[in-house]
Amino acid sequence: MGRVAVDLYAEQIGSALADAQTFRKYLGGCAGNIAVGVARLGLRSAMLSCVGQDEMGVFVTQTLKNEGVVTDLLRATPDHLTGLVLLGVDPPEHFPLMFYRQNCADMQLQPGDCDEQFFRQSKALLVTGTGFSTSAMRATSHHALDLAKTTHTAVVLDIDYRPVLWGLTTLGDGERRYQLADEVSHQYQQILPKCDLIVGTEEEILIAGGDDILSQALDNIHRLVSAPIVVKTGAKGCRIYLKGQREPLTAEPFQVTVLNVLGAGDGFMSGFLSGWLKNAPWQTCMQYANACGAMVVSRHGCAPAMPNNEELEYFLQHSDAQENILQGRNIARRHRRSTLGSAADREMFVFVFDHREQFRSSCEVTDNSRAVVKAFRQQLFSGFQLALQQDPQSRLAMLVDPGYGRTDIASHIDKRVTVGVPIEKAPSLPVRWLGDKPLYQEILQRPAPWFVKVLWEYHPKLDEQIQRQQLLRLKELAGVCDQLDRRLMVELVIPNEYTDLGSATSNAMSAVYQHAIYPFWWNIAGDFSTTRWRALANILERNDPHSRMILSCREQSEVAALGPLFTSAKASEKVSGFVIGWSIFWQAWQRLLKNEIELEEVPKVIAEDFLQCIRLWQEA
């Protein structure tokens, strides 16, 4: 319960906010970050707050849902904007913040937003100190605490003290973390008796305890409540003060290179709760908390920096043995599952009409104009939409041409549809990138949810220098996709005349992984046996278990002939869909050029054939 907003993080490291040129947009706010953090660590998390009925509110809500956070108690208000924060990264000491939160949405919660039945289903309620900084929110927050007690829901307090949000500093001084104020201490001391766990920095303990001497502040708190007090001490780790025990419990910190301390406390809290709510020993809770905090401080952003269970486990197992472990590929690959999701969760049926060269050549032969191609592609898109209407349950995707009609199509794409756009100039060997812009800029300007597809040739008969260039280009592309959080589909091309297509495919995939390149999807063509598909699946299992193969049907001329191909591919659990285009639309294109069908007839033909392909897959 509490702050959930949008963080705009300066991308220029070591720069004052005044000099920042570009910003990355993330979900933020103390409570929002923790909701994401605990969800990534396997807890069932829900968000009790408000967002504005604005585009940023849509972003916050959708991001929470994507992270697995329940949003049933997240209300949208038409009268208030979603809060914004500008953040700078100037390590090791300066991390400026500017809060744009005047009368913002997440401070508009009402007592009626606290659903008693939902509370009864919940093991704990986490509240943050900012929720008590205004009179209206104070009343709602106390109502929530009282309801938690009635429903036997544990109360966790993240002190989360920001002087600027209590009106104690100028509006631009968001970086200040500590300023003694008797009235603020008084408000915190109304909260403390209702808490079962209290977490804060040393400075926050001082303000909650109403004293500038830590030991006295701790005593003051424990006179009000018996709850354990967890004190975050940054690079020194943490301490737990239990009432009646003179010496605190301590745990060793993890030594990492600090990039950004903002959000570290939220990572710490997420890790601590992942142990505490499962009744883990105090040492385990502290170990999880210190590890999660350490991982977050090494990254840009707050919510997106939160680790998942797989990362946490790997970090705890290997942090002593591997120097700079957080900059290594093993952690990065595991973290990517949180930022991009898992391909295992995305069975896809992809309709592709990005055959640029084929259409261009066809127009030259038949003396038709580009306008004819554009009109035909619009009908292909209409056919895809018709298929989507008739089969709304399947996950349909489309791969669109970056030139012909992309802008027109993009404005009409249903949000349920996964969209990809090629990045390569086809044909090109070594692979060359589309457009005149640098690769980073080209991908940056595309909608963020769209995936990147590259047609990439690699096999042992290529000259060794070409092989090296292909791998270097692919590594460059994968690096840009990682920086921009874009999913990468590698469409592996091996010539038809290759005598052992299965071995060549295995060798190419292995070479990619040996160069620390991890595609989200592999687009694989081949009429392979079930044994070969399983061998390819083993390569994924060894190198990147969350990646998946998508079967390419580019060599098939008849839809009806796809059944046996689908059956073989589905013998492997690592194949999660198919890509098809030519087999569906090329005959219609040829018939259109010969005036054998009208343009308006194309959508029905396309939809019927695409849906038949989906049925064949589901029956295989």
Spans of model-derived segments:
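Conserved N-terminal subdomain of the carbohydrate kinase-like
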Residues: 44-129, 313-322
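Alpha/beta catalytic barrel-like cores
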Residues: 324-462, 559-576, 586-620
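Conserved phosphate-binding/catalytic region of the ribokinase-like
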Residues: 146-150, 210-330
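Glycine-rich phosphate/adenosyl-contacting loop at the front of the ribokinase-like
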Residues: 1-70, 109, 351
